[in-house]
């Protein structure tokens, strides 16, 4: 993943992406919009790029706006026929079919109840329809997606969520050197965390939350504080 030095403004045309789209598949993320054959920015901020062809604008926002391909954490709110209504922190609730889980069928439905936490991917998202979620990849396997049990759930800023999801994130690598854990991060500003004990889980959650104020530059200090806390 790379960050360009280009700052874009709403309505600005992004010619570089248009040119790239002529020779390869390009995916537009939050902050970018396709208008006929042109690509324009819909938000202000640094233009970001992830190989091979994903672009988005890293704009600070308080409310999550769903985009196709996003990894999110959702809370099941209700069942409606063959669908489950899921709170993903957006303006509208999302939906997920019982068939959107690995090995699901009419006779083998997932047993979800209100309050369950799921790690899912946004399949469809537009202004005209409610977001649709899936808990499987393109070959029908769940991977890390699905229902999350036990652990500790907390919220963070959308920017921190995106930072933690970057490939080779130095924060998660540094924390892994301190102790083993499981984590699921959503770009909708939600995190699920599970370590061997409650004390370790809370310590990790506090360390990650501290990044809201200090940033990656203080990760060594944060990890040091984590070690001191665990030894106390």
Curated annotation (Swiss-Prot):
Q: Which Pfam families match?
A: KH_6, Rrp40_N, RRP40_S1
Q: What is the effect of changing residue 11 to A?
A: Results in reduced viability, shortened lifespan, age-dependent wing posture and locomotor defects. Shows a mushroom body beta-lobe midline-crossing defect
For this entry, list what GO says about its biological process.
Answer: brain development; CUT catabolic process; exonucleolytic trimming to generate mature 3'-end of 5.8S rRNA from tricistronic rRNA transcript (SSU-rRNA, 5.8S rRNA, LSU-rRNA); larval lymph gland hemopoiesis; mushroom body development; nuclear polyadenylation-dependent rRNA catabolic process; nuclear-transcribed mRNA catabolic process; poly(A)-dependent snoRNA 3'-end processing
Print the keywords alphabetically. Cytoplasm, Exosome, Nucleus, RNA-binding, rRNA processing
Q: What is its main location?
A: cytoplasm
The highest taxon in the source lineage is Eukaryota
Where it sits in the cell: the answer is: Cytoplasm; Nucleus, Nucleolus; Nucleus
InterPro entries reported in the protein's UniProt record = Exosome_RNA_bind1/RRP40/RRP4, KH_dom_type_1, KH_dom_type_1_sf, NA-bd_OB-fold, RRP40_KH-I, Rrp40_N_euk, Rrp40_S1
Q: What happens when the gene is disrupted?
A: RNAi-mediated knockdown in the whole body, neurons, glia or muscles is lethal. RNAi-mediated knockdown in mushroom bodies affects the morphology of the alpha- and beta-lobes as well as ellipsoid bodies. RNAi-mediated knockdown in the wing pouch results in severe wing development phenotypes and increase of miR-252-5p expression.
GO CC annotations on file: cytoplasm; cytoplasmic exosome (RNase complex); exosome (RNase complex); nuclear exosome (RNase complex); nucleolus
Gene Ontology terms, MF aspect: RNA binding
The answer to whether keyword RNA-binding applies is yes
Q: What does this protein do?
A: Non-catalytic component of the RNA exosome complex which has 3'->5' exoribonuclease activity and participates in a multitude of cellular RNA processing and degradation events. In the nucleus, the RNA exosome complex is involved in proper maturation of stable RNA species such as rRNA, snRNA and snoRNA, in the elimination of RNA processing by-products and non-coding 'pervasive' transcripts such as antisense RNA species, and of mRNAs with processing defects, thereby limiting or excluding their export to the cytoplasm.
* Assembly information from the UniProt record: Component of the RNA exosome complex. Specifically part of the catalytically inactive RNA exosome core complex.
Q: Which family does it belong to?
A: Belongs to the RRP40 family.
Record protein name field:
Exosome complex component RRP40
Q: Which gene encodes it?
A: Rrp40
């Amino acid at each position: 993943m790379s960050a360009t030095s280009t700052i874009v403004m709403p309505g600005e045309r992004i010619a570089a992406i248009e040119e790239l789209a002529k020779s390869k598949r390009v995916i537009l993320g939050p902050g970018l919009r396709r208008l006929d054959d042109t690509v324009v920015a819909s938000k202000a901020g640094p233009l970001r790029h992830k190989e091979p062809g994903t672009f988005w604008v890293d704009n600070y926002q308080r409310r999550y706006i769903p985009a196709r391909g996003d990894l999110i954490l959702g809370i099941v709110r209700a069942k409606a026929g063959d669908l489950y209504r899921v709170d993903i922190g957006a303006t509208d609730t999302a939906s997920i079919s019982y068939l959107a889980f690995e090995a699901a069928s009419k006779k083998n439905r997932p047993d979800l109840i209100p309050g369950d936490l799921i790690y899912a991917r946004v399949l469809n998202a537009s202004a005209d329809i409610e977001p649709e979620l899936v808990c499987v990849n393109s070959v029908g396997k769940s991977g890390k997606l699905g229902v999350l049990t036990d652990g500790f759930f907390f919220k963070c800023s959308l920017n921190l969520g995106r930072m933690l999801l970057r490939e080779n994130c130095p924060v998660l690598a540094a924390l892994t050197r301190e102790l083993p854990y499981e984590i699921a991060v959503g770009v909708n500003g939600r995190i699920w965390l599970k370590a061997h004990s409650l004390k370790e889980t809370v310590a990790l959650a506090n360390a990650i939350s501290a990044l809201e104020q200090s940033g990656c530059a203080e990760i060594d200090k944060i990890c040091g504080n984590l070690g001191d806390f665990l030894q106390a």
